[in-house]
């Protein structure tokens, strides 16, 4: 003869199922929390890797001693071309060069033995030294691909210091990365003039967002010398959902003065 559950048995069963359900729910909640935390940390790590690798790739091809740091920004001058020369020119040129890339454009600037980042922005300041502006583009063809060419220049002062390896760097527009603390973001800026008033985000126009959730950012410049390359220390701290990831990265500038 069969019989059904008694009321007491049913109540006990419901209580036991509730306890098991709470236990399993707690385990599932912990697992979900671990997954969310892991995902948040991985997202921060990916952002940090992307930003440090992008900055390192650009900085390594910067004009030596062109890096400046101020107001949460780091600015540098990308090399658009380089060349070797035989003799220094007069202030009125021309400058006889053998460019690496066979293109020399009007209004590009060139520098021999760069020593000061601020001076690289200064032409046509009367105090600008070792710097000239190219006054006319040079057209390359089969007749001058492998020979030195005369590049028309105009300089505020004569060139007086030789490069140990007789190298010239050509550049045009600066690039800057700026940390906006109130937004906890880093933006990249380009296309603004060399004649900016100061190194600050309000001088650059609109920037491109490179990373966010940055609680701290610091840039330190170890300038180049004749014996060693320049070194840029990038210190970033990312924070989100209770997770924090710190990056201490060194970017080497490949070129020497």
Residue ranges of model-derived segments:
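Aliphatic-rich helix starts adjacent to a transmembrane/signal segment
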Residues: 5-60
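Generic, ordered loop/turn and secondary-structure boundary motif
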Residues: 36, 45, 169-171, 211, ...
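N-terminal leader/signal peptides at the extreme start of proteins
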Residues: 1-3
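Generic detector of short, locally flexible boundary/turn motifs and exposed helical patches
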Residues: 8-10, 17-21, 38-44, 143-144, ...
């Amino acid at each position: 003869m069969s019989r059904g559950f008694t009321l007491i048995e049913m109540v006990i069963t419901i209580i036991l199922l509730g306890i098991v359900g709470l236990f399993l729910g707690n385990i599932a909640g912990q697992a979900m929390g671990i997954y969310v935390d892991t995902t948040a940390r991985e997202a921060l790590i990916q952002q940090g890797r992307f930003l440090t690798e992008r900055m390192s790739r650009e900085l390594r091809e910067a004009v030596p001693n062109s890096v400046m740091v101020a107001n949460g920004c780091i600015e540098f001058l990308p090399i658009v071309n380089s060349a070797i020369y035989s003799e220094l020119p007069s202030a009125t040129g021309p400058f006889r060069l053998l460019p690496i890339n066979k293109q020399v454009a009007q209004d590009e600037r060139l520098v021999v033995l760069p020593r000061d980042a601020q001076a690289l922005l200064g032409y046509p300041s009367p105090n600008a030294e070792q710097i000239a502006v190219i006054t006319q583009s040079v057209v390359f063809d089969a007749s001058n691909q492998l020979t030195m060419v005369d590049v028309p220049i105009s300089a505020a002062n004569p060139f007086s210091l030789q490069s140990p390896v007789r190298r010239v760097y050509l550049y045009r527009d600066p690039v800057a990365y700026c940390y906006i603390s109130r937004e906890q973001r880093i933006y990249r800026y380009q296309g603004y003039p060399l004649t900016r008033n100061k190194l600050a985000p309000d001088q650059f126009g609109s920037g491109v967002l490179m990373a966010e959730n940055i609680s701290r950012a610091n840039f330190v410049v170890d300038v180049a010398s004749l014996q060693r390359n320049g070194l840029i220390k990038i210190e970033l701290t990312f924070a989100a959902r209770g997770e924090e990831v710190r990056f201490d990265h060194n970017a080497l500038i490949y070129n020497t003065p």
